[in-house]
Regions:
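Signature of lipid phosphatidyltransferase scaffolds
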Residues: 1-8, 18, 120-160
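Acidic/glycine-enriched edge-of-secondary-structure segments
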Residues: 3-24, 42-48
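Short acidic-hydrophobic, aromatic-tinged amphipathic segments that line or gate anion-handling sites
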Residues: 20-22, 102-106
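Short acidic active-site motifs
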Residues: 29
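Primarily the HKD phosphodiesterase
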Residues: 32-97
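Short, well-ordered alpha-helix to beta-strand connector turns
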Residues: 37-38, 110, 118
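Short solvent-exposed loop/turn micro-motifs enriched in small/polar/acidic residues
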Residues: 105-108, 132
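Short beta-strand scaffold segments in enzyme catalytic cores
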Residues: 112-115, 139
Length: 160
């Protein structure tokens, strides 16, 4: 099947591109986006797994070293079953040591997204910090309007 990238313009006339990824292709592109981040990375993922963190910790360390602000929005560990609770607690401690700001949510938190430099928006069904075996989909939208729309919709300015 041919991969397609859709380029368009939004209501303001600004150009944007949109591309779909499955769980097999997501991380390659997402890691490139993280490596290219210039100022800020926001990741919202309700679950955290030790196995997935093994892939992400090296890039998080590089981002911290480059003084890129990284915010992780996730569930409070107490809201997880025991298996995920300890993995979440371990990752949150690791984030804090690296200088990454974890923002803990309460009450059925289940959104999965990332905003990079407020210019790239990733959204879909894939838990960025925990996905291992499940079949998922993520859409990458490159266009400041969409990233800022999500940032404003989530009222993130109150927390960052």
């Amino acid at each position: 099947m041919k991969k397609m990238t859709k380029s368009n313009s939004d209501a303001s006339g600004s150009l944007f591109s949109s591309k779909l990824f499955d769980e097999n292709r997501f991380y390659d592109c997402f890691l490139k986006d993280l490596n290219n981040a210039k100022e800020e990375v926001i990741i919202e993922s309700p679950f955290i797994s030790t196995k997935r963190m093994k892939l992400l910790v090296p890039i998080f360390k590089k981002l911290a070293k480059r003084k890129i602000k990284v915010y992780i929005i996730t569930r409070r560990p107490e809201e997880h079953v025991e298996e995920y609770r300890w993995q979440s607690e371990k990752a949150i401690r690791m984030f804090e040591v690296m200088g990454i700001q974890p923002l803990l949510c309460v009450g059925n938190h289940h959104r999965k997204l990332a905003i990079i430099d407020r210019e790239i928006l990733w959204e879909g069904s894939l838990n960025i910090l925990s996905q291992i075996k499940s079949r998922e989909i993520m859409r990458r939208i490159e266009g400041e309007h969409f990233a800022l729309e999500m940032f404003d919709f989530l009222k993130l300015e109150k927390f960052l």
